[in-house]
């Protein structure tokens, strides 16, 4: 028999001992053995005799509770979650800004920075801005983006081809290619690392461009 009315689904922290909202549960012992169906009261007493807790671990298709040290259980679970989180690679979206008439030196500076992002596993938005009458020459922008991609294609794939946005920006999206990245690392004796640094987005103002 279950409680009357619509029951608010409790969190795991609430579903222990006297807070278990069922009169009977299928009990699993402290060593993983199947005890069987008991009244919740009996199961709680059994747990207390062992100085442990009765924890509801499942409600479908039937209520299942396990006898364990809930404090230790929470600690171990938190520890595992933290370890799993640390193993995750944080993928960030970076940005590189260009202009159609960017000089060779500055293009190479941008490409080197882009390679740092790609080696960290980040995606890149390459945004080329047309200024003044440059918007009448979109082919210049495409040519610059093609040149930029050639400088980083040993690490990247084009995730999205160059597209004109608001008649002022030509945006292209790049993503790291794992096979290319691994090959590059081996060739350059680089150690893999997870990037947790702050946004490294670069604008043309961040580099010393030569006179055009």
Swiss-Prot record:
Q: Which InterPro entries match?
A: T_IF-3_C_sf, T_IF-3_N_sf, Translation_initiation_fac3_CS, Translation_initiation_fac_3, Translation_initiation_fac_3_C, Translation_initiation_fac_3_N
- What would be one Gene Ontology cellular-component term for the protein? membrane
Enumerate the Pfam families for this protein: IF3_C, IF3_N
Compositionally biased residues, Basic and acidic residues: 190-203
Q: Does the keyword Protein biosynthesis apply?
A: yes
Tell me where on the tree of life, at the top rank, the source sits: Bacteria
Subcellular localization, per the record?
A: Cytoplasm
* Major localization class: cytoplasm
What GO biological process term is on the record, naming one? ribosome disassembly
Q: Which UniProt keywords apply?
A: Cytoplasm, Initiation factor, Protein biosynthesis
Drop me one GO molecular function for this one: ribosome binding
Q: What does this protein do?
A: IF-3 binds to the 30S ribosomal subunit and shifts the equilibrium between 70S ribosomes and their 50S and 30S subunits in favor of the free subunits, thus enhancing the availability of 30S subunits on which protein synthesis initiation begins.
Query: Which family is annotated?
Result: Belongs to the IF-3 family.
Quaternary state and partners of this protein? Monomer.
Name by which UniProt lists this protein = Translation initiation factor IF-3
Organism (species): Mycoplasmopsis fermentans
Q: What is the lineage of its organism?
A: Bacteria, Bacillati, Mycoplasmatota, Mycoplasmoidales, Metamycoplasmataceae
The UniProt gene name for this protein comes to: infC
